Amino acid sequence: MTLANKLTLSRIVMVPVVIAVYYLPFSFSGVLAAVLFVIASLTDLLDGAIARKRGEVTSFGKFADPIADKLLVAAMLLPLCGDGKIHAAIVFAIIAREFIVSGIRLVAVSSKTNSVISASWLGKIKTVIQIVAITVILLGNWPFSLINFPMDQILIWLMLTITIWSGADYLIKYWGIIGETK
């Protein structure tokens, strides 16, 4: 197994750790969860860079990397929703998009072309915005709360917008593959 794939798997392993820390009964659990969430998110940058630098880009990595991102993001959206920090309809829309895009990827792999769909530039921007938004929410909108600026709310709406946009982009680009399954 390549180092890049190990980093991807480590991101998946960190998901329950970040959630457990978020629920710890002390005042700085959100901050600690944010730190762990950022560390887990940074493995997303590292795994791709390492795979490309070493010439170790694999089909597993192309498929597992976006799944690891989705797990990390969805796993944090749910408790934030449960705590009333993000509206349930927004979380539903984001998670629904992730299932739809994952479904498109599965169909592409099982199609006649046996295609592995890598993350698009728009999908990568979406992931970065989701990570930034979740981090700011975990930090209680700090440092923006010091100047009474609702950055968390702005990021939530930006996250929803880019998520829907990138989902529509995948649907438009890969709609033809859906009819080509074996």
List where the protein language model places each region.
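Alpha-helical transmembrane bundles and membrane-interface segments of multipass inner-membrane proteins
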Residues: 1-182
